[in-house]
Amino acid sequence: MIELGQSYSTIQAMTKQKPLKSLRQRVKENQTPPNRSQNHLGILRPSFSQHSRERKMLHSTSWLDGLRGISATCVVVHHCTLQWFGWHIHEPWFPGQSFLKLPVIRLLISGSPHVYIFFVISGYSLSYKPLKLSRQGRFDEAASVLSSSIFRRHARLFVPTTIVTFFCAIMTQLNWYGKAEHMPGVAVPAWEPPHLDNIWAQLNNFAWNELLFMDPVGRTVAKGDPGEQVKQLHNPYDYVLWTLPVEFNSSMVLLMFLMAFSRVESRARMAFCLAMAVLFQCFFIYWALFLFFSGMLICDLRLELGEALSTRAPSKDTRSWSKHLFVRAIGVGCFVLSLCALSTPHLAFGGREAPGFVTLASMIPERFGDQLLMPIAAIGLVLTLDHHPFLQVLFTNSFAQYMGRISFALFLVHGPLLNTLGHALGRRFIALIGGDTEERYLVAISLTAMVFWLMTILLADFVYQYVDLASVQVSKWAYQRLLRTEEQPGKYEWKSR
């Protein structure tokens, strides 16, 4: 990410090297002068249509971005199904029922499994650079990275959230939110934030709720049933944001652990990390911390194996094609097994009687509910992908990488859009086409989904470019400006770029 100060100095250098050409010179060289209207409208262009931008090079962990993008897409689909269909499509599969309920396929309309995947990815991503620097003996640099991450983490998560939910408060005053009575029979009625008498009361209510939502200390740690977390941690202006306080608290605990153990011998650190993960899950059912620490452990294991391979003498791979095929078969088997375990129906809604899951569900203690098998399956999925690069191609394609880039913005905007545009379109298409038969209803919802997804992708892309990236750049800039030099330990040195 280019910092603001660095980009300014780069522009200065460019202008010194190549003086600006006059309009006459540009016309002579058949260069059309810039169009002001095009410049102003340029901010509305989605990032994928800007052909001048070079394609981002893939790196060793790019598949994590793609996996995050696919999971974010499935979460949006899940929330759409809750507002456009009844609970029946999320029930366990039984012979003769819809194919959408089948294992693996049901992940396309599920929500909880992808939340677990998000948290494993977050643990891996936050740990990767500090662990890599620590293993290289660059402890000061690792400490600097951790310090920067801790400083910027709250702003990284909550500044874009505050900006988006501010517009939710405005939309509430404009009566853009739908009412539950217009869509009967759906699993979750349309959500409407608190509606106050005037704009000033609305903004005051928004400000207080936002401050409570961003509380870095008083929020409860994710424990037990995620359904209870939704009730305790949700933002009144967007109920899907309940995972952000969980993400913040879990990331702070992980970063504190990394800071404490960055200088510890690698295998000892891995042993402590494993012990902490087991303790969090088995004794306290802190499933979010379990997932974050497991993500860190997977990352540390990958770096450990990389070091072991680098110390070996170079030799030709003499394995036969049958051994290669066997290794790939193991990878595919673990991948499919992880997806099947992630597809476990909610035990409280008939999952213990679902075909194929009866024996497995009977082995899970009651106290864990759904917070044992699916988290372990999410860990298994990331672990499998990390050690079988041939499977990573599923998440390094252009679509997955693009969805990964806009995943946080997509997460922020889809809830408000679903409860305003998605709800209104659903009512109007049903009124136009009819919802008296299943076929008519599906046609109406399909048209609704097409328009909703188009607008959601465009808005998410806009928020990604001008809110998400900007908040990252500003937080980095602020951190750099507040740093003090080691030569003057008692005075703050304001850095000029």
From Swiss-Prot:
**Keyword field contains Transmembrane:** yes
Name of a matching Pfam family: Acyl_transf_3
Task: Return one GO MF term.
Answer: acyltransferase activity, transferring groups other than amino-acyl groups
- Glyco sites are at N35
Look at the named UniProt entry and state the broad enzyme category this protein falls under. Answer: transferase
Key words, A-Z: Acyltransferase, Glycoprotein, Membrane, Transferase, Transmembrane, Transmembrane helix
Compartment annotation: Membrane
Q: List the disulfide bonds.
A: none
Which parts pass through the membrane?
69-89, 107-127, 157-177, 241-261, 278-298, 329-349, 375-395, 406-426, 443-463
The pathway this protein participates in, as annotated, is: Mycotoxin biosynthesis
What membrane topology was assigned to this protein in its record?
Answer: Multi-pass membrane protein
Statement: the UniProt record of this protein carries the keyword S-adenosyl-L-methionine: no
Enzyme Commission number(s) from the entry? 2.3.1.-
PANTHER family of this UniProt entry? ACETYLTRANSFERASE, PUTATIVE (AFU_ORTHOLOGUE AFUA_4G08520)-RELATED
Q: Which family does it belong to?
A: Belongs to the acyltransferase 3 family.
Record protein name field = O-acetyltransferase PaAT-1
